[in-house]
Amino acid sequence: MALKFHVLHQSKKSRARVGKIETAHGIIDTPAFVPVATNGALKGVIDHSNIPLMFCNTYHLLVHPGTEAIAAMGGLHKFMNRNAPIITDSGGFQIFSLAYGSVAEEIKSRGKKKGSSSILEVNDEGVWFKSYRDGHKLFLSPEVSVQAQKDLGADIIIPLDELLPFHSDEKYFLSSCSRTYVWEKRSLDYHKKDPRHQSMYGVIHGGIDPEQRKIGCQFVEDHPFDGFAIGGSLGRNLQEMLPVVDVTTSYLSKDRPVHLLGIGDLPSIHATVGLGIDSFDSSYPTKAARHGLILSSQGPIKIANQAYANDLSSLDPECTCATCTSNISRAYLRHLFKVHEPNAAIWASIHNLHYMQEVMKNIREQILNDEI
């Protein structure tokens, strides 16, 4: 079945809302944080049954083991042994972010310079690129991308789009926006021929140009997408991103869920949930965990600091995750990181993912109380 979206409460204070998305593999309470399982796995976490929605990258799964191989095994849900919703991207995000840097990197001023050799050619038909594994030449078109996502069988899929960095010149930027919407229309047409249980979100581009964002919103509104996704360049920092998200959500109808692509750090979530964002995806909590940054109700903890060398308290006294209830102390976790014990990243990742789910639960409660 295609997804069904229900708004349970609209805040009286902002555009924030509490809702639920029904899919063939389960219900997602919104606003929701969506962790990224790049290769079909959450790094450092074995049990993902308590994660309502996971984001898997089509590009990586296309390169290995191959989406046709996964289809032959019954799809991504069976391959991963997951009986809960999955969202996949088009593959375009990974191709272009490997070349230019991701949206999140750009916001943190770490975007790569244009000219990476991973992209060989971009034209109206699609994009030719080199495999990051062996340099093999690959081609991705709207139809190839959607078929790959059909093979994977994700509940929510994304049409092919072109991700440009902030520093693109205006002429190429405008031609890219036009090409993206042609690609999205082709993606949607291909999807509608065989929708199965899947739903497709339309991606809104336009950079930081309000008029181009309005055009993008009009495009997705005029086509039967099941939800909206805000993509493309969102500026160089949070201050530039906020007006982009604000103007974009102001143009969108309220009957479909809105996802913010590639953004899911805590400051961004707190800043944009009131603008009407229903879901966020990011590898932030697991990546932070692998680098020894622990999220907690008392603020972030850099576990390598000497201050925690003899600290036998739990990572977060308010937390009920498997790490904290197993009495893994700050001192012990610091020791594991210092000796490069793999368990360190596992314990930290379990905690950070649980913490993010609790943050979203608290946000939903605040919206219900019209506090956001």
Curated annotation (Swiss-Prot):
Alphabetized Pfam families for the sequence: TGT
Task: Return the InterPro entries for the record.
Answer: TGT (IPR004803), TGT-like_sf (IPR036511), tRNA_ribo_trans-like (IPR002616)
What is the main EC category here?
A: transferase
- Give any GO molecular function from the UniProt entry: tRNA-guanosine(34) queuine transglycosylase activity
| Chain positions recorded as Zn(2+) binding sites | C319, C321, C324, H351
Q: What does this chain do?
A: Catalyzes the base-exchange of a guanine (G) residue with the queuine precursor 7-aminomethyl-7-deazaguanine (PreQ1) at position 34 (anticodon wobble position) in tRNAs with GU(N) anticodons (tRNA-Asp, -Asn, -His and -Tyr). Catalysis occurs through a double-displacement mechanism. The nucleophile active site attacks the C1' of nucleotide 34 to detach the guanine base from the RNA, forming a covalent enzyme-RNA intermediate. The proton acceptor active site deprotonates the incoming PreQ1, allowing a nucleophilic attack on the C1' of the ribose to form the product.
The record's comment on cofactor binding reads: Binds 1 zinc ion per subunit.
Q: Where is the active site?
A: D89 (proton acceptor), D281 (nucleophile)
Q: Which family does it belong to?
A: Belongs to the queuine tRNA-ribosyltransferase family.
* Residues that hold substrate according to the record: D89, S90, G91, G92, F93, D161, G232
Oligomer status and interactors: Homodimer. Within each dimer, one monomer is responsible for RNA recognition and catalysis, while the other monomer binds to the replacement base PreQ1.
The protein's annotated pathway: tRNA modification; tRNA-queuosine biosynthesis
Which Gene3D superfamilies does this chain map to?
Queuine tRNA-ribosyltransferase-like
Q: What ranges does the record give for the region RNA binding, renumbered to this chain?
A: 262-268, 286-290
Query: What is this enzyme's catalytic activity, as reactions?
Result: 7-aminomethyl-7-carbaguanine + guanosine(34) in tRNA = 7-aminomethyl-7-carbaguanosine(34) in tRNA + guanine
The biological processes this protein is annotated with in GO are: queuosine biosynthetic process; tRNA-guanine transglycosylation
The entry's protein name is: Queuine tRNA-ribosyltransferase
Q: What cofactor requirement does the entry state?
A: Zn(2+)
Q: Which organism is it from?
A: Chlamydia caviae (strain ATCC VR-813 / DSM 19441 / 03DC25 / GPIC)
